[in-house]
Amino acid sequence: LFSAPSQTGKSTQAALWAQHRGAEVLNGDKAAVRLDGAPTVHGVPFSGTSGICRNVSMPLRCIVLLSQAPENRIRRLGASEALALLPQNAFADASVREEWQRTLSLLLDLISAAPVYALACTPDVRAVETLEHALVRDGF
C-alpha cells in the first residue's frame, strides 16, 4: 500500500509495479484498510486523478510512505516513527477528539499488523528494484 500526499507519485509507483512486476492496482489515489482478521486493502469507488478504482480486495503486506528523491533510499520504520508519519495520510478531523483518538488507535493496530517503510524514490524502475530488494530481504 503506497501512502503519500497528493502529487508525490503513488500512481506512478503503482504503474511501475504493474508494468515491471505484474502488480494489480486497486486505486490510484485512496484505499480502505480492514484490520479485523488478516489485514486487507480494499479498492474504493473514488479514483481521484488516476481514474483507477477497482472493487477488489487483497491482503495488506506492507505500507510504503513515499517521497520524491534524486536517488532511491528505503528504510523500515519503527512503530513510533511510523505512528508519527502515518496520520498525515489518514482521514480524520483532528478537531473532533473522539474521531482523532479512534484514528490513532486504528493506526496503532495498522502498524502492528503490517511493516511500514519509507521510500524516497525516483519515478522509474529503480524504485521498484529498491523496494523489492528490501521486501525480499525482510521476508516479504
Q: Predicted regions: what is each one?
A:
Residues 1-4, 18-140:
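Glycine-rich, often acidic-flanked micro-motifs
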Residues 10:
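Conserved lysine of the Walker
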Residues 13-14:
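Post-Walker A alpha-helix
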